Amino acid sequence: MSKRDGREVDPDRLYLLSSTSQGYAWLLKLFCDPGDYVLTPRPGYPMVDQLAMLEAVEVDNYFLSWDGAWLTDVGQLRQHLQTSTPSALVVINPNNPTGSYLRPDERAGMVQLCHDFSVPLIADEVFFDYALSNVFRERLAGEERVLTFALDGLSKNLAAPHAKVAWLEVSGPDELVRQAQEKLDQIADAYLPMSDLITAQLPSLLDAIGSQIETVRDRLRKNLQRLRSCVAASRTGVMDLYEPEGGWSALLRFPAWIDEDELVTSLIRDAAISAQPGYFFDMPTAGFLSISLLLQPEVMAAAAESVIARIDTAVEATLF
């Protein structure tokens, strides 16, 4: 991590976990009593909501809006914090499913808000190294101005769902870190997620990250270009691709009157293609599909053509 980020990472501030989900669960235990709430992004991955529910913790949202890029209204977030203080602020960098990285002003604004209102910052950065463009990006891991908990893991870095090892880095003002680690150590001691069987394999797995990320990122970028081409070739021209800046998926926008469930189930039934409907992620409106970019290139090309053709056919059926 020190080599990757170009900074000194203190191993005493690192926790090994069985998964990032476990990291979330630990942090919810650390900061929340039953009935407390955390702030999470919307659109966003539903896993955080599910984990919060299991800890009897509520979830409220701050919002990303699309204006040619996904943007966070930091001013609106400040207004929220002025009326109610969450137990923690969750940031997904880059976001899933939007694929948007925090912009410099957003990053600075969120750090300042956490400082002003004494709110811990939870940064989920599992997709950080899968940049699909040359957009500015900066990790929150290692942030020193506010109490920060950065999550990352092998399963995303290796694109290997079975590689269930994750890590949590604590950073921030020394006294706040000390107080948090006293309690976090107790939680870690209660769960003991690691064993010698797992840690013995870590060096070789960590060594493989660089080349694996490069291989996967190359596929993601090529598949994104294939999807762009298919959208551009649409017979009806009613679809838009909301360009991701990073991550493993892309959002396809289509007319909202096309039922997402019907579209997804018909793709599974008739073409053996699986995509995720937008409402899985609390998209602001109907008419979205989240499409994986991880497929083998030849599979991706055929699948993208089938999805676009299916939507074109639905639109044409209403016009003629």
Predicted segment positions?
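Helix C-cap/helix->beta junction micro-motif
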Residues: 55, 84, 116-117, 271, ...
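Conserved core segment of the aminotransferase class I/II
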Residues: 142-221
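Hydrophobic residues in well-ordered beta-strands that form the structural core
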Residues: 40, 61, 123, 275-277
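PLP-dependent aminotransferase-like
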Residues: 29-91, 104
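Phosphate-binding glycine-rich loop
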Residues: 1-37, 257-261
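PLP-dependent enzyme catalytic core of the Aspartate aminotransferase-like
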Residues: 79, 266-275, 281-320
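Conserved glycine-rich beta-strand-loop-beta hairpin in the small C-terminal domain of fold type I
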Residues: 203, 218-228, 240-253, 285
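Active-site phosphate-binding strand-loop segment of PLP-dependent enzymes
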Residues: 68-137
